[in-house]
Amino acid sequence: MAAKDVKFGNDARVKMLRGVNVLADAVKVTLGPKGRNVVLDKSFGAPTITKDGVSVAREIELEDKFENMGAQMVKEVASKANDAAGDGTTTATVLAQSIIAEGLKAVAAGMNPMDLKRGIDKAVVAAVEELKALSVPCSDSKAIAQVGTISANSDETVGKLIAEAMDKVGKEGVITVEDGTGLEDELDVVEGMQFDRGYLSPYFINKPETGAVELESPFILLADKKISNIREMLPVLEAVAKAGKPLLIIAEDVEGEALATLVVNTMRGIVKVAAVKAPGFGDRRKAMLQDIATLTGGTVISEEIGMELEKATLEDMGQAKRVVINKDTTTIIDGVGEEAAIQGRVAQIRKQIEEATSDYDREKLQERVAKLAGGVAVIKVGAATEVEMKEKKARVDDALHATRAAVEEGVVAGGGVALIRVASKLSNLRGQNEDQNVGIKVALRAMEAPLRQIVLNCGEEPSVVANTVKAGDGNYGYNAATEEYGNMIDMGILDPTKVTRSALQYAASVAGLMITTECMVTDLPKGDAPDLRAAGMGG
């Protein structure tokens, strides 16, 4: 086992604080509308330029192992805030740095670290309740656009695009961010249900100019099995040909003789058919087939429930107004399924979302809800260079998470004002002893830190602005972009309550643990190995 280096008491805490300060100082230059960028070197390709706090934090690794431990613990604050709300990572880092610095001063002055932590925790619990009381719902498009704009570093086009996307696919809809091809940002909305499976044969294409298959008012056959024998398909094909409508087959696979016969029938114009593979794998495929059946008013032909393809009738088929299939995707538009059945299916999936344990499962279930309930919106980010594209994409992602958080828990006045109002309301909060009271004061003083940092990044004097804002009440605050005072809500400077709450809770959680640290243990750096190249040579 490798030898260890151990540091105790003040020696350990000073080293740890130095690491905290290096990471926090690198992150906090990005805070606010006039925050600066950070350039991150990459082992290959062009450097990345970012104004996203968590991206900066993730890159920092220090040489001194004790300092690095401090930095890594604050990195955890930024990551947790990012996971919970998708934004507020820089605010969380600034809060953590302030609580740790003030808390360690109090420990050095002889306060009991455990009581300090209890005081900090008490202040944070009370602050979260006050934040909830200050919160107002965020329901209209204007407020959603304002939240998106602030989170995307005052980029109004991004805020408007996100509001428009939410308008079109609903607040539960899936909104994804992709690289665009031009210089402008674009919004692309896919209505209906789209899944990532294309046609099984290019011979099905009936719109050569777009390379797509378009079927008007088709019957939709859903089969949870491989189809390779054309005999079991004949009754269905004959019934569809009599009805004079096209047919879409969605099955585990269609191959061999069956696929060849379908292609020949299509080319001769006997019956218009297209076949695609069912989306997903295993249990997820079964669930998605059932989703499509609900949407189109059909039945999944599955041998598990004793149904045979040969006995399928037109009553078992789903129907839709239109289906568009290209090389990679299939889109079903306006399925004829009953609204009550669709809502019941959506409620069932939502229940599964609540019980899901992994983020991946939750995300996939959320996508299924969106496909059934609304649609999918894609924001295509435009930029002149790849470096700018990466930076902008990160900002749009942040803005998207922030707007979702705002819809979920409401909004409070932005620019650090909400935390200052909370701190002033809690000025009479007391603990069980004097050390706890100091802990409460440490937490309340830290709540001023985000506003002070925003002002500092503007090149103004933090104390002057902080005192002016404290002298006001309600939503009165400082607009750092225009350098004016006024009502933050009226000026459109909003922060999602969830983002502010998560930042405060995670900062206090990690900072409290660091204040109560008395000993740090790490591996000793390995010394230079002796040069043995000439060992054993004769004299």
Curated annotation (Swiss-Prot):
Chemical reaction(s) catalysed: ATP + H2O + a folded polypeptide = ADP + phosphate + an unfolded polypeptide
Q: Name one GO cellular component term.
A: cytoplasm
Please give the SUPFAM superfamilies that the UniProt record associates with this protein: GroEL apical domain-like, GroEL equatorial domain-like, GroEL-intermediate domain like
What PROSITE patterns does this protein's entry cite? CHAPERONINS_CPN60 (PS00296)
Q: Which UniProt keywords apply?
A: ATP-binding, Chaperone, Cytoplasm, Isomerase, Nucleotide-binding
Residues binding ATP are 30-33, 51, 87-91, 415, 479-481, 495
In alphabetical order, the GO MF annotations are: ATP binding; ATP-dependent protein folding chaperone; isomerase activity
- Where does the sequence pass through the membrane? none
Q: Where in the cell is it found?
A: Cytoplasm
- InterPro entries found in the cross-reference section: Chaperonin_Cpn60_CS, Cpn60/GroEL, Cpn60/GroEL/TCP-1, GroEL-like_apical_dom_sf, GROEL-like_equatorial_sf, TCP-1-like_intermed_sf
Q: Which GO terms describe its biological process?
A: protein refolding
Report the EC number(s), separated by commas if there are several.
5.6.1.7
Q: What does this protein do?
A: Together with its co-chaperonin GroES, plays an essential role in assisting protein folding. The GroEL-GroES system forms a nano-cage that allows encapsulation of the non-native substrate proteins and provides a physical environment optimized to promote and accelerate protein folding.
The family annotation for this protein states: Belongs to the chaperonin (HSP60) family.
Assembly description: Forms a cylinder of 14 subunits composed of two heptameric rings stacked back-to-back. Interacts with the co-chaperonin GroES.
* Name used for this protein in its record: Chaperonin GroEL
Q: Which organism is it from?
A: Kluyvera intermedia (Enterobacter intermedius)
Ranked from the top, the taxonomy reads: Bacteria, Pseudomonadati, Pseudomonadota, Gammaproteobacteria, Enterobacterales
